[in-house]
């Protein structure tokens, strides 16, 4: 049986007095690609931030390799887990190489500054993402897809095998969405990285993830393989969406086809 790298146990998380995620249990299996889906405001990003130790738990816990993440030193967590928030912003004038080099901070200390190992990690990350030729450009000069690959490069330079991505395709056109998700899939296949990402596009989630977690109102409604999660009944329950689900003619994964008002069969 595949072990869980990251777990939530009776996890509740919120902002101020508002509870967003309530009494939630989740297992992220080692070597899996998990996509968290659900309507706006259901708690997807809040859950991811809690899993990445960016938000403290109100109650319950997050476990990283079986140990409570809130009791693990920050630097040690950063050597194992990398998280990219939604729409990250780089300081003006920062080059791609300088951004990627920031991924090496968890591996440095006052007695050990920049090393040949750091240099090699940055070069490898740039090569893996196809960004080596753009290393000298500033981040603000890049296209949306290139910018996202630069941030992923930084996460790769961090040297972790657990990657959390909060809506990595936001504000990208379809071609760049595919480009970024192809990269994530390749990184997973070549290195066995465990990936958790929040995605809005259900069809892309089904195509690129081997496990879906569907949330509503701060709770997990259903989780499992895409074919088990993206059913017409579940789409209606989670999204209030009347839709048909057919096999994707390219990938064979579930393809969600929403039904507009004009195309609904009249009730008898």
Predicted regions and their residues:
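Conserved structural motif at the start of ABC-family nucleotide-binding domains
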Residues: 6, 21-23
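The feature captures the beta-strand-to-loop junction immediately N-terminal to the Walker
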Residues: 37-39
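Helix-to-loop junction immediately C-terminal to a conserved catalytic motif
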Residues: 52
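Conserved ABC transporter NBD signature motif
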Residues: 60-68, 77
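Conserved ABC ATPase "signature" region
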Residues: 101, 116-134
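Conserved ABC ATPase signature
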Residues: 113, 138-142, 146
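Catalytic Walker B motif of ABC-type/P-loop ATPase nucleotide-binding domains
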Residues: 163-167
């Amino acid at each position: 049986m595949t072990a869980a790298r990251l777990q939530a146990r009776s996890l509740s998380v919120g902002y101020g007095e508002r509870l967003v995620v309530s009494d939630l249990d989740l297992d992220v299996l080692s070597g899996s690609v998990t996509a968290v889906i659900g309507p706006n405001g259901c708690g997807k990003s809040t859950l991811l931030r809690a899993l990445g130790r960016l938000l403290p738990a109100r109650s319950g816990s997050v476990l990283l390799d079986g140990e409570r993440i809130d009791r693990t030193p920050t630097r040690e967590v950063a050597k194992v887990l990398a998280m990219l928030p939604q729409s990250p912003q780089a300081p003006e004038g920062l080059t791609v190489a300088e951004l990627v080099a920031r991924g090496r901070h968890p591996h440095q200390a006052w007695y050990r500054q920049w090393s040949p190992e750091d240099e090699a990690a940055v070069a490898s990350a740039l090569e893996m993402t196809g960004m080596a030729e753009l290393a000298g450009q500033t981040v603000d000069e890049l296209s949306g897809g290139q910018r996202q690959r630069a941030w992923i490069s930084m996460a790769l330079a961090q040297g972790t095998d657990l990657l959390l991505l909060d809506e990595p395709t936001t504000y990208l056109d379809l071609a760049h969405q595919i480009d970024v998700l192809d990269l994530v899939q390749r990184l997973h296949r070549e290195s066995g990285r465990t990936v958790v990402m929040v995605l809005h596009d259900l069809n892309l989630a089904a195509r690129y993830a081997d496990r879906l977690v569907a949330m509503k109102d701060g709770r997990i409604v259903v989780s499992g393989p895409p074919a088990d999660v993206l059913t017409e009944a579940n789409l209606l329950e989670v999204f209030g969406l009347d839709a048909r689900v057919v096999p994707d003619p390219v990938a064979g994964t579930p393809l969600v086809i929403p039904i507009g008002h004009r195309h609904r069969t009249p009730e008898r």
